Amino acid sequence: MKKSKWLALAGVALLSVGALAACSSKSSTSGTTYGYIYNSDPETLDYITSNTEPTTVAVTNGVDGLMESDKYGNLVPSVAEDWSVSQDGLTYTYKIRKGVKWYTSDGEEYADVTAKDFVTGLKHAADAKAGALYLVQDSIAGLSDYLSGANKDFSNVGVKAIDDYTLQYTLKKPEPYWNSKTTYGLLFPVNEDFLKNKGKDFGKSTDPTSILY
């Protein structure tokens, strides 16, 4: 998504802590390159399953969620261009911006970002028992049952791709602050075909080609 930034970040994020410390006092950037010095290496690039700061800081420079915080801390649309909330406060419907693309680490266009990618992302989080699931497992309808094994059909979980560019979450109870949770990597999109192709190598920390951007 933010491919122009990530092409510089991918290599930096994978350098050792020692190397970073050694060069922390020196930096050079061109007018088209974004540089950032990390304090520690991410153990994984799987932004869905990891809730650690190194992964979050590295990957969110290249991958977007539905909403994001501006420099003043206000929630603003990112991949979502608009949203609505049902009168009972239980259903959030997001319109996904058309034209948002997935890119490989080489900057090659891979696919459109669609509503289905957000469904795939949450299913990946649930199946992998992501560390941050506690943030949403009691929020999204049916998710706690899926995690406990009481329900084995993910289609019963309250996240649906109504069409390619319409995503819907159904909550167990009203949460006025729900939109803030969409900024967590846990609820970011994942391309299903890419995830299947990579298998266990998805998000491998030493391989910038292991995720899309």
Model-derived features with residue positions:
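Bacterial signal peptide processing site
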Residues: 24-26
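Aromatic- and charge-enriched surface segment that lines or borders ligand/interaction sites
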Residues: 81-134
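Short, well-ordered beta-strand elements
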Residues: 30-40, 91-95, 118-121, 167-168
